[in-house]
């Protein structure tokens, strides 16, 4: 089959926003205007098409990023048809993993902000992730019809809170009840959408007289931003020449692709105004797969040689699995992004991360949770495969003759865990299966069995994250579970360097004995300086320990790191230098050196000023002004460090850093303190030393 849409007319975009900025409604409108969706699904009554899990419809928040394909030829049918693949990303802070995962496979993003609430804490998290993956983006300021809507205020916040360089493409005509349309600052015309056909048609009109001066001022700002794209344009502009509409658009596009500016549009998705022009901006200013750098990877040649794949059908096939979802009718759906080449249903590909072959059974293009079977996918496509056996998020699928491993995604460690048990013994096996499946879908969620208590432990990014996992077990797998009290994922570390710590394991009792002897130094590493949180340096001179036993020493220490001497929590940020020891020709063995290393580690750890580390959360609370004192007092009681506060239209925003162990049940407490009027977000920030009294209590509770 030949390619139907040239790759330059593809746009792989994410729609990303804070909770309640109206992202789901915005996505619905995109699907409506692109002709996919004939009845607009309203999130207010739980009928939105993109939110395809029952819970999302109940909670009114988007959890799973579903991928959808749509086509757009422009508001005035001014373009050839463009194919837009939309990855819907969740806005709740417990689901940042989903956002991170979708950012990885996007070429561009639309950031949706609320015209009243502006740039929220979660918006900042998403912004950082988009920066990390260098995703070009534009902004859509939604809810211009709401009380308190202020477009230019939000433009200001994009500058001050996100440190970005926002350039408005439009101005709002009116606001709140009086919001009627937008001024297009490139064409210098007003756009008036037709209410009778839900905004499918529109008219260009003259800019209202009372807005002429403001429009001229912001038009100048737009032209200046465009002129900065090149010296030629700057000379033309400074020489007093007019820039053509084409020149302005090309220059702005170049600057968006270079991540130098953020173009800002506005509207009200709910009132059918503005989404149409934002779609035009996606085509005019966001990149196609050929506008972004080739994806980097490493060859599977034993030397990890760097390689890249360009967005072309002629290169070998390569794709990245970015999401695994369980579908009640077909089982596993593996969402993947094709970076290069072509693959047909029925083809065999290589999972280069696991060095296993997989057969592409059926390939489907998704529209929210409806699907259409397709025979092939090409560079730039996003689709889902049914029936892949052993693929996890972040795996590379590629041509078996040209193996490559694309960059791995990095997933955060969980910060909270709870014990779960099925309500009936009969459900034990079912629960195991359910949790295994859910863990495969979501790498930030972990499951294990506690060896001492034999309980099943689940761990994730926050209380809501785990609530939803328990909820999904019940809905999708019919397993009801009892849930224990949440536990904090503490860590252990050392604060001092210790030298010449000896570990000796010697047993001579008739026959072959065991002998291992090591001398090590232990020292703290700078937090975050080593991705593994551990380094091992072999400084043995003159063969006092033979080379074959060195890995056993390393392994002996690594095994101890899983359960530290203080309270049995993982040890992090530790460096070990092995520099002396001795061995016995007959009695030495790998096991003896492993045991000697573990003896030295335990001895050294005790002397190296061991500390217990606790997870600290970044907490932001928005509260009515009259409750500020109570909220701050409560955060202080929870050992919170106040980091600042600012006045908002809706009250006061408080920034604090609080230990996770003090935040359990916070939602309920905040509701009662503020009669339900405050809201908060919380995300993991860092690990820090726990105060003595806290550490002691934790150590005693663990029976150490």
Curated annotation (Swiss-Prot):
It comes from the Bacteria. The keyword Secreted does not apply. Keywords: Cytoplasm, Elongation factor, GTP-binding, Nucleotide-binding, Protein biosynthesis. InterPro entries: EFG_II (IPR041095), EFG_III (IPR009022), EFG_III/V (IPR035647), EFG_IV (IPR047872), EFG_V (IPR035649), EFG_V-like (IPR000640), EFTu-like_2 (IPR004161), G_TR_CS (IPR031157). Pfam families: EFG_C, EFG_III, EFG_IV, GTP_EFTU, GTP_EFTU_D2. Residues 8-290 form the tr-type G domain. GO terms for cellular component: cytosol. Catalyzes the GTP-dependent ribosomal translocation step during translation elongation. During this step, the ribosome changes from the pre-translocational (PRE) to the post-translocational (POST) state as the newly formed A-site-bound peptidyl-tRNA and P-site-bound deacylated tRNA move to the P and E sites, respectively. Catalyzes the coordinated movement of the two tRNA molecules, the mRNA and conformational changes in the ribosome. This is Elongation factor G. It comes from Salmonella typhimurium (strain LT2 / SGSC1412 / ATCC 700720).
